[in-house]
């Protein structure tokens, strides 16, 4: 069994520029291993993700050798015509004439209201009727109750893209299990994003790794995370943002679904990880464009987590923090406008965490 899809978001870079040679190599390795499903979005990497699809995938491989999914940034449109303009831009960037799967991006309560206002679900249906999208759906970041409401009103969609990983499975904020079960109730197949939680489950405390080694010592921490998501029966695709050939090879290996006993062991690792993680940030970056003070929120939270795991390393961590503040607002620059919190898929209390960052890392 292998349900792995290639998420074109966390692509390899050299000096902040995409490394197209490396992307070609990873793309080719994924296809050679039997992979077919590629996922991108209008807003990923400021449009460079879709451009990379066109350059590294569509221009180099036959169209029938892969499936391509992209997403409408419906939160940025102001009319139905805007939906068409954005969609046509995406086709051009990706170098294709249709998408196998086309989704509304990042539905929460606010963005769902916009989708209703601008008839974005009708737009998805029109694309399907014209053969420009074979399947439709949406990516989702809100409660199971709202998801139930959306799927009841719009049963014509085929997929829901959910954040699912073993750390968030029972989370009250993310509601991964409840949202998954809502999709099952409505007969919708699930595509998984963030199976490794933005990479944070690739590097876990030694105590958690020792627990996971009891399940399979040959698997890396990231491998265990991907296996968990692939083991869910109603999951059709598990997206992984791979940036090395080694990651492709491990993730594309044949996977045996987890047993109930293995799931129980994994929950023991969850307790260890949660106890060692101060801020549960995935570094998705959705907060950044809303911050009026240009605060490097994900970078600061990563440093703060490192500090909290070993405060004695502050002599190594604070210089890195200070160097970031030369180009970005410091944690102390926060004015508590909470625009970041309103756009955080993880529902983090970002303002409070920034106060903790300030107290730990500033003026050392």
Q: What are these regions, as identified by a protein language model?
A:
Residues 22, 107-282, 286, 290-295, ...:
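Beta/alpha (TIM)-barrel catalytic core signal, keyed to glycine-rich beta->alpha loops juxtaposed to Asp/Glu
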Residues 1-66, 123, 129:
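N-terminal binding-site loop/beta-alpha segment at the start of enzyme catalytic domains
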Residues 39-40, 70, 192:
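Hydrophobic residues in well-ordered beta-strands that form the structural core
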Residues 259-278, 294-332, 337-341, 347-364:
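Ferredoxin-type iron-sulfur electron-transfer modules in oxidoreductases and energy-metabolism complexes
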Residues 64-76, 102-105:
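A short, structured active-site edge motif that brings together acidic residues
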Residues 9-21, 71-81, 110-113, 209-217:
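Active-site mouth loops of central-metabolism enzymes
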Residues 2, 36, 97-100, 134, ...:
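Short acidic/polar active-site loop segments enriched in Thr and Asp
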Residues 48-59, 80-91, 95, 112-122, ...:
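Distinct, well-ordered alpha-helical segments
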């Amino acid at each position: 069994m292998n349900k792995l899809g290639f998420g074109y978001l966390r692509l390899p870079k050299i000096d902040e520029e995409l490394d197209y040679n490396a992307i070609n190599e990873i793309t080719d390795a994924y296809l050679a291993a039997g992979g077919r499903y590629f996922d991108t979005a209008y807003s990923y990497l400021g449009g460079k993700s879709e451009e990379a699809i066109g350059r590294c995938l569509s221009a180099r491989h036959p169209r029938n050798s892969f499936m391509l999914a992209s997403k409408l940034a419906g939160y940025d449109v102001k009319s139905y015509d805007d939906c068409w303009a954005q969609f046509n831009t995406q086709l051009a960037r990706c170098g294709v004439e249709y998408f196998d799967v086309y989704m509304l991006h990042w539905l929460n309560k606010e963005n769902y209201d916009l989708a209703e206002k601008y008839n974005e679900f009708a737009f998805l249906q029109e694309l399907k009727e014209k053969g420009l999208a074979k399947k439709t759906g949406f990516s989702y970041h809100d409660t199971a109750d709202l998801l139930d409401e959306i799927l009841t009103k719009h049963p014509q969609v085929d997929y829901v893209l959910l954040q699912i990983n073993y750390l968030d499975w029972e989370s009250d904020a993310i509601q991964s299990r409840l949202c998954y079960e809502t999709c099952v109730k409505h007969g919708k197949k699930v595509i998984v994003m963030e199976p490794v939680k933005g990479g944070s489950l690739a590097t876990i405390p030694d105590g958690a790794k020792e627990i996971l080694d009891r399940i399979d010592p040959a698997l890396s921490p990231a491998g265990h995370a991907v296996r968990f998501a692939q083991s869910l029966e109603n999951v059709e695709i598990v997206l992984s943002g791979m940036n090395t050939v080694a990651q492709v090879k491990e993730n594309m290996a044949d996977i045996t679904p987890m047993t109930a006993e293995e799931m129980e062991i994994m929950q023991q690792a969850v307790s260890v990880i949660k106890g060692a993680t101060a801020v549960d940030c995935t570094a998705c970056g959705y907060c950044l464009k809303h911050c009026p003070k240009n605060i490097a929120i994900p970078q600061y939270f990563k440093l703060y987590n490192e500090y909290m795991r070993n405060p004695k390393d502050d002599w190594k961590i604070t210089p890195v923090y200070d160097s970031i503040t030369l180009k970005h607002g410091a944690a102390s620059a926060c004015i508590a406008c909470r625009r970041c919190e309103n756009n955080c898929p993880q529902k983090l209390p970002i303002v409070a965490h920034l106060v903790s960052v300030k107290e730990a890392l500033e003026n050392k």
